[in-house]
Amino acid sequence: HLCDRRQRQMCIRDRYKNTFLFYLPRLCEHCLNPACVASCPSGSIYKREEDGIVLVDQNKCKGWRMCMSGCPYKKVYYNWTTGKAEKCIFCYPRVESGLPTVCAETCVGRIRYMGVMLYDADKIKDLASTLDEGDLYEAQRQIFLDPNDPDVEAAALEAGISHDWIEAAKASPIYKMISKWKIALPLHPEFRTLPMVWYVPPLSPIAQAVDVGKLSMKGFIPDVQSLRVPMQYLANLLAGGNVKPVVEALSRLLAERTILRKYSDNAGTSQFLTCEILPEQLQGIEEINELKALGLTVQDVCDMHRLLAIADYKERFVVPSANRNTEAAVLMQGSQGYNLGGGEDMRRRADSLFGGPMNRKIIPLFEEYQRAPDSTQGGK
């Protein structure tokens, strides 16, 4: 039996690269403890208090490029034309208007979600100081607050968080996947930057091996622990090497899919596809004890299927608009705007590394732009 198990593991491992495609969209994590902010000598990188987005102040950036080496995810880039650092801005103008990011909205697989998470900022230092890398996932999950808790809601209002943002946190799909169902995991938590972009681990090739009858069943749920090679691979990627949270997340996903597949045949395919199966129809199922062991209820199974399979636009993206009533944004209309590729405005403001005038040429974006006068030659 042990020999057969090892042969099965070797077979799945050898065929892993040929039978399983795992596309991992790696973008800026907009961390709670961003290393790029700490490594910038000029202090040009900052994390916004109102929404947690990490941005680069182009007027302060001096091109030291220490943020590039400081970011463990390598998501800060250097613009050789402007001499400035650039990174993902999380589409903050769209987020301020209550819209999702472009990458999330244009995802054809509809696998990206956006929402509000409330957290205790006073615990960040203790969390980042956790000794065991395997405990970092659970430690970061504990920093998130329950928006439905009256004490948390009162503290949020006292801290200046608007009522709209609190209501958005209650309806956040991110909170459900991270804190309620525990099916989302952070990317490389051992970096200790506390990333805020989390990932739901893939079911393949685990589920594929189950479908063809290569794995044993543990109750009604396939025994995912028999595949230690994929488990450890995903654990090193998403849980700091701790296999337990990965096994639990995949077990919950497999339980949801197994139950919905089994009982959708009785309810009809149309009801399964539109999630019209009511929790009352699943109350007497024989798998109720296994669900309790996984920390799930029948309502959780229906909600998971709704959110992960057929959720609409408003369910996947719960983004409240920013409250900027005190700013006169209308005064900026008609200006040049976000210009980092050259242009007359950029050439007149271009500085060298140490604050003096930059004498090198910057190719303009349009031919009709006139060349900026050279101050060293007394041009006007």
Region spans (language model):
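Active-site-proximal loop/turn and secondary-structure-junction residues that shape catalytic pockets
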Residues: S44, Y77, L118
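Cysteine-centered iron-sulfur cluster-binding motifs in ferredoxin-type domains/subunits
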Residues: Q7, F22-G43, E50-K74, G83-T106, ...
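Long, compositionally biased charged/polar accessory segments in the mid-to-C-terminal portions
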Residues: G109-S375
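Basic, glycine-/proline-tolerant helical and adjacent loop/strand elements
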Residues: Y16, E49, W80-T101, I111, ...
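Single conserved hydrophobic/aromatic residue that forms the stacking wall/gate
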Residues: H1-I12
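Short acidic DE-rich linear segments
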Residues: Q377-K380
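A structured beta-alpha segment of the ubiquitous adenosine-cofactor-binding alpha/beta core
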Residues: R13-L21, P25
